[in-house]
Amino acid sequence: MIKNPKVLILTAHYGNGHVQVAKTLEQTFRQKGIKDVIVCDLFGESHPVITDITKYLYLKSYTIGKELYRLFYYGVEKIYDKKIASWYANFGRKRLKLLLQAEKPDIVINTFPIIAVPELKKQTGISIPVYNVLTDFCVHKIWIHREVDRYFVATDHVKKVMVDIGVPAEQIVETGIPIRSSFELKINSDIIYNKYQLCKNKKILLIVAGAHGVLGSVKELCQSFMSVPDLQVVVVCGKNEALKQDLLGLQEKNPDALKVFGYVENIDELFRVTSCMITKPGGITLSEAAALQVPVILYKPVPGQENENAMYFERKGAAVVIRDDSEVFAKTEALLQDDMKLLQMKEAMKSIYRPEPADHIVDTILAENHVEPNHIPIKSPALAQSFT
C-alpha cells in the first residue's frame, strides 16, 4: 500500500484541452487528499523550439494548413508501427529521466500521447504504473503502447476500436473525458440570465469563436442572426481582443440582440442557458456540451481528431456538422426553429455523457495502487463576475 503517493501528470500545450484535463485530474487528486501532484509539459520543457514550431503548425491547421494536418494525422497512423515509433518514443527522454530521478513518482498519467515513459519501462525494466487518459472521441495509434497499464476512454466505441487493434479489453475503462467540476454542478438559471443580461423568453445562440480563427466571418454571421426575431446571440471571443472590439460596435447598435464577451472563466453558465452552440469539435468542449445537454453545430472540423469527433457526434444525432461557410446561417436558423430536433439532440447528448469522469479515473487509479482516498468536500462556487 502506498500511503502518500506522488503523482506525475504529463501533458502538452497543443490547444487547451490536454492541459485542462491534466489540471482537472490534479484538482481531483487533491480533493481526495493526494497532495503531491505534479503537472509537467514534457515536450515543451524538453524541446522548446520544436514545440513552438509544431504548436504554430497545429494552430495553422484551423486556417491554411488543413491538408497538411490531414496528411500528418492519417499518414502517421498508417506508418506509425514501422517508422515513427522508435523516434517518437525517445522524444523528451532526457528530460523525463531527470524528472523521474528528481521526483520519484509512484504513478504516471499521460493526458497527451507521450510514450516516453512506457518505452523507458520497456527498455530499463523500471516498475511504475502508467495510465493514458485519451482526450478525444477517437483513438490514434500513437496513444498505444504495451507498457501502458490502463487506458481511460470517452466511449464504448473507442474501446471497441482499441480492442480491434490489439489492446486487451481489461486494460480499457470507459469513463468519459475529464471536465471541470463546474459543469456538473446544479445552478439556478435565473441567476445566469441576470448576470449576463439575457432574456429568458428568447432563444439563445452561443458562438464560441476562440482566438485561433476557428470561425470565419463572425461579424457577418452576427449581423445575419441579429435579424432573427426572438433570438439573442452570445459571442465568446476568448483572448481574441481584436474580434471582441470589432463586435462591440454591433452590440452597441442592438444590445438586446447581441452580447459580446472576451474570456469567460465560468463558461458553463452560458452553456446552461443556450439553445444551441456553434463551436469547434474538440474533445473537451464536446464532453462539456454533453454534460449540460447542449446541441452543437460543429463548424468545418479540421481533418484528424476533430473530424473524427464531429462524425461521432453527428452519427449519434447530437450535432449538426457544417463544412461550407454558405450553410452556417441557414442550417443554424433551421435548427433553432425546430424544437423537436433540439430536444432529440439534447437526448443524444445525454446518452453520450458519462457522469463524474475525473472521479471515476482517480478512484480507479487510487484503488489499483491501494490508496485510500480522503475526500475533502468542495463548496459550490458563487457566480462571480468572471468575464471580460
Curated annotation (Swiss-Prot):
SUPFAM superfamilies: UDP-Glycosyltransferase/glycogen phosphorylase. One of its GO terms (biological process) is glycolipid biosynthetic process. The keyword Membrane applies. GO terms for cellular component: plasma membrane. Keywords: Carbohydrate metabolism, Cell membrane, Glycosyltransferase, Lipid biosynthesis, Lipid metabolism, Membrane, Transferase. Pfam families: Glyco_tran_28_C, MGDG_synth. It is found in: Cell membrane. It is an enzyme of class 2 (transferase). It catalyses: a 1,2-diacyl-3-O-(beta-D-glucopyranosyl)-sn-glycerol + UDP-alpha-D-glucose = a 1,2-diacyl-3-O-(beta-D-Glc-(1->6)-beta-D-Glc)-sn-glycerol + UDP + H(+); a 1,2-diacyl-3-O-(beta-D-Glc-(1->6)-beta-D-Glc)-sn-glycerol + UDP-alpha-D-glucose = a 1,2-diacyl-3-O-(beta-D-Glc-(1->6)-beta-D-Glc-(1->6)-beta-D-Glc)-sn-glycerol + UDP + H(+); a 1,2-diacyl-sn-glycerol + UDP-alpha-D-glucose = a 1,2-diacyl-3-O-(beta-D-glucopyranosyl)-sn-glycerol + UDP + H(+). Its EC number is 2.4.1.315. Pathway: Glycolipid metabolism; diglucosyl-diacylglycerol biosynthesis. GO terms for molecular function: 1,2-diacylglycerol 3-glucosyltransferase activity. It comes from the Bacteria. Signal peptide: none annotated. Processive glucosyltransferase involved in the biosynthesis of both the bilayer- and non-bilayer-forming membrane glucolipids. Is able to successively transfer up to three glucosyl residues to diacylglycerol (DAG), thereby catalyzing the formation of beta-monoglucosyl-DAG (3-O-(beta-D-glucopyranosyl)-1,2-diacyl-sn-glycerol), beta-diglucosyl-DAG (3-O-(beta-D-glucopyranosyl-beta-(1->6)-D-glucopyranosyl)-1,2-diacyl-sn-glycerol) and beta-triglucosyl-DAG (3-O-(beta-D-glucopyranosyl-beta-(1->6)-D-glucopyranosyl-beta-(1->6)-D-glucopyranosyl)-1,2-diacyl-sn-glycerol). Belongs to the glycosyltransferase 28 family. UgtP subfamily. This is Processive diacylglycerol beta-glucosyltransferase. It comes from Bacillus cereus (strain ATCC 10987 / NRS 248). The lineage of its organism: Bacteria, Bacillati, Bacillota, Bacilli, Bacillales. The gene is ugtP.
